[in-house]
């Protein structure tokens, strides 16, 4: 049980929902430069399993690490934190 709780959890923004049951989530993190101490923004995209196709473009979502579901998918959708507003 404790092993399941040690899985990585990220919060990011959906940048693509064109695939069936798959979304692409952009996760932005900050790291401090070792020499200069300046915070530098890094971003990474994760393909995420969305069983019900519930997440839409621009939504803020929480994803969790899981077993490999395909060649590129290693995360699953936990919840939609905030839905995007379409103007």
UniProtKB/Swiss-Prot annotation:
GO terms for cellular component: cytosolic small ribosomal subunit. Keywords: Ribonucleoprotein, Ribosomal protein, RNA-binding, rRNA-binding. One of its GO terms (molecular function) is structural constituent of ribosome. PROSITE patterns: RIBOSOMAL_S17 (PS00056). It comes from the Bacteria. One of its GO terms (biological process) is translation. Transmembrane segments: none annotated. Part of the 30S ribosomal subunit. One of the primary rRNA binding proteins, it binds specifically to the 5'-end of 16S ribosomal RNA. Belongs to the universal ribosomal protein uS17 family. NCBIfam families: PRK05610.1, uS17_bact. This is Small ribosomal subunit protein uS17. It comes from Staphylococcus saprophyticus subsp. saprophyticus (strain ATCC 15305 / DSM 20229 / NCIMB 8711 / NCTC 7292 / S-41). The gene is rpsQ.
């Amino acid at each position: 049980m404790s092993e399941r709780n040690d899985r990585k959890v990220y919060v990011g923004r959906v940048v693509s929902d064109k695939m069936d049951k798959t979304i692409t989530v952009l996760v932005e993190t900050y790291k401090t430069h070792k020499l200069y101490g300046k915070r530098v923004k890094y971003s990474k995209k994760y393909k995420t399993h969305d069983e019900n196709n519930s997440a839409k473009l621009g939504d803020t979502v929480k994803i969790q690490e899981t077993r490999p579901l395909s060649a590129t998918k290693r995360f699953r959708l936990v919840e939609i934190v905030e839905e995007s507003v379409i103007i």
